[in-house]
Amino acid sequence: MQGSVTEFLKPRLVDIEQVSTTHAKVTLEPLERGFGHTLGNALRRILLSSMPGCAVTEVEIEGVLHEYSTKEGVQEDILEILLNLKGLAVKVEGKDEVIITLNKSGAGPVVAGDITHDGDVEIANPEHVICHLTDDNAEISMRIKVERGRGYVPSTARIHTEEDERPIGRLLVDATYSPVDKISYAVEAARVEQRTDLDKLVIDMETNGTLDPEEAIRRAATILAEQLDAFVDLRDVRVPEEKEEKPEFDPILLRPVDDLELTVRSANCLKAEAIHYIGDLVQRTEVELLKTPNLGKKSLTEIKDVLASRGLSLGMRLENWPPASIAED
């Protein structure tokens, strides 16, 4: 089999071996040499870190104020109960968060199947043990908040945002949202006709039961394809930053000379020379102003001092003066 150097083999055989409802092996072959590790490592990382799922994030247990306590009639302490609740495999349809409840009395184990929930919630491991009640008079009641998310979010990451509103007795739980429990891959040799240097990728995956292994592979491949799609067309798609339009002139130059609060004599002399704006004034030199009728050295000194207090001076050069907004007036 000899193809173009620009053509790459695509897997023609995809085999899914369903070991159990939560365990599957997916085999893809043939792959070009090296592509087994390239694709296997990328899919493995996505499956571990980027699969959305649901997890317990908050718990309220009747009669319990903090996690470092115990409850009468319950074999486990509160920390151990919270640890067991982290192992709940919950699937929620159509909602980002739900509240489920657990009420149990009498001696014996308390399991996930004892939890009360509506039709939007499915518990994939109903036999999962949460705690044990030690006598017939013992009882436990709790409200459990389940949220949708991705990856791992420790409870400490939510303390600063929720502490002010969180009432006493509401316990935070580290949330592991990923439905994938274990994932590994192996690359084996594959052969197509005379070629014996090809790869076969075998992905071995276990989930918590809320996500089918085949669907997990499909989602991971979709995420990878969407991320790589940006590299197909390398045009610069950045939104150009809007540059702030700097005014052509300092706003103070556009203000009328009346704003300088000069004496009546000085102000009248400037108006007689058609000097209406501060921008008009700063372009005049001392010699030019002294030629103005009735404007003497005392008035000149006043004008210079007032301009200096505003960071201006006489004899300035202003390109493109006057601006259109003034010229139209």
Swiss-Prot record:
GO cellular component, one term: cytoplasm
Recorded GO MF terms: DNA binding; DNA-directed RNA polymerase activity; protein dimerization activity
Region: Alpha C-terminal domain (alpha-CTD), residue numbers: 249-329
Keyword Magnesium tagged: no
EC number from the UniProt entry: 2.7.7.6
Known catalytic reactions: RNA(n) + a ribonucleoside 5'-triphosphate = RNA(n+1) + diphosphate
GO biological process: DNA-templated transcription
A family per Pfam: RNA_pol_A_bac
Subunit description: Homodimer. The RNAP catalytic core consists of 2 alpha, 1 beta, 1 beta' and 1 omega subunit. When a sigma factor is associated with the core the holoenzyme is formed, which can initiate transcription.
Cited HAMAP family: RNApol_bact_RpoA
Comment on protein domains: The N-terminal domain is essential for RNAP assembly and basal transcription, whereas the C-terminal domain is involved in interaction with transcriptional regulators and with upstream promoter elements.
Official protein name in the record: DNA-directed RNA polymerase subunit alpha
Organism: Aliivibrio fischeri (strain ATCC 700601 / ES114)
Gene giving rise to this polypeptide: rpoA
